[in-house]
Regions:
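Glycosyltransferase catalytic domains, chiefly GT-A lineage
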Residues: 2-193
Length: 193
């Protein structure tokens, strides 16, 4: 069973939840990468052995529903900058990825949830990853791959500025433990301010 939850993310259930245990995956959505999003979504669904709910993090929906209010500006070359810290960023979901725990909480998701960038291609059942973190990291708030990587070029996709910083790529795929007290306490204010 696969449910695509393209939703407005209002403070109500995104969709009627299946009675069986469901894996919840939030995928970052960027309007310039719609095809990549659809490939990622399809590859997740194709290999899933358990019910799977995929939720797109569409910044327009998140803004219109009041969940994402953080402002950004764009220069003449199309480079986006965060208004709060004036740092450049490249995708529409650079900040909204951190809304996943808030959106999960208001939609009564109580187990592990996953976020991934839209350019992922899944070749195996994602349920194995969910089971792995449930069995081996139940005491952790977040699970991710701790890459030790620094960029070698100054630009990346769509000629956006490439920055090097600690923990680069760590947030490309994250699993949040909705049972952990620190994750439960996250709110949209933590992302927007």
């Amino acid at each position: 069973m696969f449910i695509n939850a393209r939703a407005t993310h209002k403070e109500e259930t995104i969709h009627p939840l299946p009675k069986e245990q469901t894996n919840f995956v939030f995928i970052g959505y960027d309007s310039r990468e719609d095809i990549a999003y659809r490939v990622c979504e399809n590859s997740l669904a194709r290999h899933s052995s358990r019910p799977l709910t995929i939720i797109d993090l569409n910044v327009n929906h998140l803004r219109s529903s009041g969940h994402f209010t953080r402002e950004w500006r764009e220069d003449n070359e199309g480079q986006k900058y965060d208004v709060l810290d004036d740092k450049p960023f490249s995708t529409e979901f650079s900040h909204t990825r951190f809304l996943c725990p808030h959106l999960a909480k208001i939609n009564n998701m109580k187990n592990w949830i996953m976020f991934c960038d839209c350019d992922f291609l899944f070749l195996r059942d994602i349920d194995k990853l969910f089971k792995f973190v449930e069995e081996n990291h139940a005491d952790k708030a977040v699970a991710c791959v701790k890459f030790d990587w620094q960029p070698t070029k100054d630009t990346k996709m769509d000629n956006q500025k490439q920055l090097g910083y600690d923990k680069k790529l760590w947030s490309s795929l994250m699993l949040f433990n909705m049972k952990h007290k620190d994750v439960k306490n996250l709110s949209s204010d933590d992302v927007n301010t």
